Amino acid sequence: MASESSQSSSPSSSQPPSSVPSPSPGNNVGDTFIGSFISLISKYEIRYEGILYHLNVQDSTLGLKNVRSCGTEGRKKDGPQIPPCDKVYDYILFRGSDIKDLQVNPSPSAQSRQEIQSEQDVNQSPHSRPAMTMSSPISGYDSGYGLGRGSQWINTPALSSKPVPVTQHSSVPLSFQPPSANAGSLTESPVSLIDSTQSNAGSSMPIPSFVQGNKFASSGVPLGMMQKPVSSSSTIPNGPQIIDYFSSPIMGLVDDSSQVVTRSPDVSSNQSYSSNPSPLGQTQLHTPPGLASVSSNLSPPSEAQLSAPNIQKIYPSAPQAIGKVVYDPQSNHPHRSIPHELPAVASNSAPVIPGPLSKSPESFFDMDPSLQSRQQMVYRGQEMFAATNPASANVPSQSFAPRNHAPLLPLPVSAHQSRIPSSSIEYTEEFDFEAMNEKFKKSELWGYLGRNNQRNQNDYGEETAIEPNAEGKPAYNKDDFFDTISCNQLDRVARSGQQHNQFPEHMRQVPEAFGNNFQRPPPLQPGQGAYLAAQTNYRGGYHNNNNNNYYSNSGYGYYSGGRGRGRNTHF
């Protein structure tokens, strides 16, 4: 049988099953608590959790099984805290004297456990549902890509061979791929499907980007290129977008190959699209929205001039600069995808735009192939972006400037450099200290300060030395100064009754040493307060009249001997 140890405050190891106390008999009062979850705190502030299986009221003992120690949990005031233990004990028998606090929590029933398990399954169901395939017709399913008519896309190999997982929070199939090689087997055109989807789902529904023709059938376009939604804003109307996937070095401007670069159609914002699909072998003229005013003044080319074979004959391998719209790959919401105009290079099937945007093939690849690095391509992309800007549409075309060209305007001068004069003084020789010492008139300086004899020149140019003052005051006399004011002789004289005869002499010595303002009266006998008040300015106002060569003092004095008021003159 195991019990809690008073020294280590930890339960002992489990004993053999033979010594385990049997459950309480049926007539015991505590049978109703058998099987309850017990949380008790021992007298050593350690909390234990377990299931009650034995309770004896007569012996004041209880037994727990599957017991786990939770430690002191900060309740212990003296000594170190005991951390919780992960070990689960088979059983522990507690005495009533070892228990400080006890709480009974009824054990959950089997029905409540099933309800908790079912709630957990419901919460995890969106992440664990099996994947659904598009090989069977689905009624009422709309993924946002115009697949509301699932029966019309059943025969498409690109959709029937790819499983599409469907979750609760996402309405877009993750492995959607538009048809490439077998595009002719579609029962309905993609444009009509988009129009029908938009009429049902609204203008905020994302639109897939389809590929005209089968020129990407053998190129192996990555799947991530076909999953980017197109923003449906007022500046870019909803309609079929054509993907330009090319291998020009200028693609270094776009991070990774997962970016989708699309061209906006050549129509103004107040025009509408027609739902008729365009032929697969025909290419249309596309212009950025910012150049609508420029392209409106130009005569539209004929279909024969815009056909792919004619363009390939004129420029078999020269890409053209066309304004692109790159959408944010991190945003899957149509309202969060903000278009950014970025220069790019169209493929061979892109048309030639007349005007300032049309460049000769030699202007792009006029340098040595070894010099066409990534940085040079970025620099050329910036020049092409400036060419596609509407503000610079009327500027005549110019050849690209070299990378290391001089600035057109002088660089601004900082405030620190503007205070520095332009003509700097250059010192070619060292500083001559001896010559500077000769120029320095040390005698005049020291004579002015009184530390040397000042030499003056008379009217005839002769120098005369001024003799020092012979009537200078001598040094102090020790007997007359320090000994008179620093000893206690005056106190002894006052106590012996001789102070009245020596007081006038003392009053003459004190003003000579400290002046009249620093006089301090000596200790007096009783009855001499009036005399001291008449002779000193202690606590009195001072008045001096230099014209009459006299000064007068007046004041009040309060001493132990009496009170007096007087007025005196210089003596």
From Swiss-Prot:
<dbReference type="GO" id="GO:0031087">
    <property type="term" value="P:deadenylation-independent decapping of nuclear-transcribed mRNA"/>
</dbReference>
<dbReference type="GO" id="GO:0010606">
    <property type="term" value="P:positive regulation of cytoplasmic mRNA processing body assembly"/>
</dbReference>
<protein>
    <recommendedName>
        <fullName>Decapping 5-like protein</fullName>
    </recommendedName>
</protein>
<feature type="compositionally biased region" description="Low complexity">
    <location>
        <begin position="264"/>
        <end position="279"/>
    </location>
</feature>
<feature type="compositionally biased region" description="Polar residues">
    <location>
        <begin position="167"/>
        <end position="187"/>
    </location>
</feature>
<dbReference type="InterPro" id="IPR025761">
    <property type="entry name" value="FFD_box"/>
</dbReference>
<dbReference type="Pfam" id="PF12701">
    <property type="entry name" value="LSM14"/>
</dbReference>
<feature type="compositionally biased region" description="Polar residues">
    <location>
        <begin position="104"/>
        <end position="138"/>
    </location>
</feature>
<dbReference type="InterPro" id="IPR025768">
    <property type="entry name" value="TFG_box"/>
</dbReference>
<keyword id="KW-0810">Translation regulation</keyword>
<keyword id="KW-0678">Repressor</keyword>
<feature type="region of interest" description="Disordered">
    <location>
        <begin position="258"/>
        <end position="305"/>
    </location>
</feature>
<dbReference type="InterPro" id="IPR010920">
    <property type="entry name" value="LSM_dom_sf"/>
</dbReference>
<dbReference type="Pfam" id="PF09532">
    <property type="entry name" value="FDF"/>
</dbReference>
<feature type="short sequence motif" description="TFG box">
    <location>
        <begin position="498"/>
        <end position="518"/>
    </location>
</feature>
<dbReference type="GO" id="GO:0006397">
    <property type="term" value="P:mRNA processing"/>
</dbReference>
<dbReference type="InterPro" id="IPR025762">
    <property type="entry name" value="DFDF"/>
</dbReference>
<feature type="region of interest" description="Disordered">
    <location>
        <begin position="159"/>
        <end position="187"/>
    </location>
</feature>
<feature type="region of interest" description="Disordered">
    <location>
        <begin position="1"/>
        <end position="27"/>
    </location>
</feature>
<keyword id="KW-0963">Cytoplasm</keyword>
<dbReference type="GO" id="GO:0000932">
    <property type="term" value="C:P-body"/>
</dbReference>
<feature type="region of interest" description="Disordered">
    <location>
        <begin position="102"/>
        <end position="141"/>
    </location>
</feature>
<dbReference type="InterPro" id="IPR047575">
    <property type="entry name" value="Sm"/>
</dbReference>
<comment type="subunit">
    <text>Homodimer. Component of the decapping complex.</text>
</comment>
<feature type="short sequence motif" description="FFD box">
    <location>
        <begin position="474"/>
        <end position="489"/>
    </location>
</feature>
<keyword id="KW-0507">mRNA processing</keyword>
<feature type="compositionally biased region" description="Polar residues">
    <location>
        <begin position="293"/>
        <end position="305"/>
    </location>
</feature>
<dbReference type="GO" id="GO:0042803">
    <property type="term" value="F:protein homodimerization activity"/>
</dbReference>
<dbReference type="InterPro" id="IPR025609">
    <property type="entry name" value="Lsm14-like_N"/>
</dbReference>
<dbReference type="InterPro" id="IPR019050">
    <property type="entry name" value="FDF_dom"/>
</dbReference>
<comment type="similarity">
    <text>Belongs to the LSM14 family.</text>
</comment>
<comment type="function">
    <text>As a component of the decapping complex, involved in the degradation of mRNAs. Promotes P-body formation. Translational repressor.</text>
</comment>
<feature type="compositionally biased region" description="Low complexity">
    <location>
        <begin position="1"/>
        <end position="17"/>
    </location>
</feature>
<dbReference type="GO" id="GO:0017148">
    <property type="term" value="P:negative regulation of translation"/>
</dbReference>
<feature type="domain" description="DFDF">
    <location>
        <begin position="419"/>
        <end position="455"/>
    </location>
</feature>
<dbReference type="GO" id="GO:0003723">
    <property type="term" value="F:RNA binding"/>
</dbReference>
<feature type="domain" description="Sm">
    <location>
        <begin position="25"/>
        <end position="108"/>
    </location>
</feature>
